[in-house]
Regions:
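Bacterial Sec signal peptide processing site at the extreme N-terminus
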Residues: 14-33
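N-terminal mature-domain "stem" immediately C-terminal to a signal peptide or N-terminal signal-anchor/transmembrane
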Residues: 27-52
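Mature extracellular/secreted ectodomains of secretory-pathway proteins
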Residues: 43, 47-186
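N-terminal export leaders
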Residues: 1-7, 16
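Secondary-structure junction/capping motif
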Residues: 2, 34-37, 147
């Protein structure tokens, strides 16, 4: 009887062994001012920033924050319960956009999203505070392959990121309550 039970459990265990770990991500405490929802705040800010990307030139701190938000959204938004109007193509859009912004910054392809988020947010804060030592520590070369100086230069002169802009717009749309028609509400 015990042998039979073990034989029944083995295929289930084998099936679980091949699954990759589930990615998770979070934004640091205090990232969103007030009592706002961090997912909504990230989508609205990133959508606004990438909707007018030309204004990012020479603004590496703003670029770092917006890309950190996109990295967070790529992990959290596709399965988020706050998405009121889910865009069906959001997950593949985010995957393609993530490759685009990671390539533009020189982020290691296998870098865990939380390390990317933490590094970019710490870099943004270090830039705001004028702390060069903290800036170098925020962008470790095993995650940011161009090193701190190279990554900072890339953040200050981002190339056009059309896939990122499209994914940011889709993320923003997915959180906006769709308009209800007066006719539909009376039916």
């Amino acid at each position: 009887m015990l042998r039979r039970s073990v034989l029944l459990v083995l295929p289930a265990l084998a099936a679980c062994a091949g699954l990759p770990p589930i990615e998770t991500a979070s934004l640091p405490p205090g990232f969103v001012q007030g009592a706002g929802d961090p997912t909504r705040a990230a989508a609205l800010h990133a959508g606004s920033v990438f909707g007018r990307q030309a204004q990012l030139a020479g603004q590496p701190g703003t670029a770092a924050r917006a890309i950190a938000e996109m990295e967070y959204l790529a992990v959290e938004l596709p399965s988020s319960p706050v998405a009121r109007n889910p865009v069906p193509t959001l997950q593949p859009q985010m995957q393609v956009a993530r490759r685009e912004w990671r390539n533009a910054l020189g982020v290691a392809a296998d870098a865990p999203p939380q390390r990317v988020i933490n590094g970019l947010i710490a870099a943004s804060r270090a830039l705001e505070e004028g702390r060069q030592d903290a800036l170098r520590a925020a962008l470790p070369p095993e995650v940011f392959t161009a090193g701190a100086e190279g990554t900072l230069a890339r953040l200050g002169a981002l190339p056009p990121l059309p896939r990122t802009a499209a994914a940011a717009a889709s993320a923003e749309r997915s959180l906006i309550q769709p308009e209800r028609s007066p006719v539909a509400s009376t039916l």
